[in-house]
Amino acid sequence: MPTLRPYHPNDAAVPTALYVRSVRHYGPRAYSPEQVAMWAATADVARTAARCGDGRFVVVAQDEAGSLLGFADLEADGHLDLLYVAPEAERLHVGSHLYGAIEAHARRRGLHRIFVEASELARPLFERRGFTLLGRNDLVLDGVDIHNYRMEKRWVEMEVQGLP
């Protein structure tokens, strides 16, 4: 089972490299070589460091040796921006552990929803976690057509008074 811990600023290069490896490994299962190349090219260490240091909640998963297995983030408004798992951690439920930490954090913060733009590959993970499909985004990035899905999960915290 992976260990979850908060992101540390010294981690910036590692999640960026993991992001690229993840996109290149999993991407071809649902996207063309051109789409995968464009997606992987969006990785940038400085941008990762800026994003992860801007106050959002960032959690990383690591193995016993301290190697990064995945990472995820949640912005203050409930937007889950990134959730990536290393190819060598496939089928170890790292994505589920990361998502669980994200949702627990959102609930502790008093949020009532999480929303995401999920890739074709991530959509099933979010559907299994109770997300609703809101629509498909058809995008052109750097001249390449690609798509993702707008999804959200809402919950209501209920207070029942007068019950034991």
Description of each model-found segment:
Residues 115-117, 132-150:
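Conserved catalytic-core motifs of GNAT/GCN5-like acyltransferases
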Residues 106-119:
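Conserved GNAT acetyl-CoA-binding A-motif
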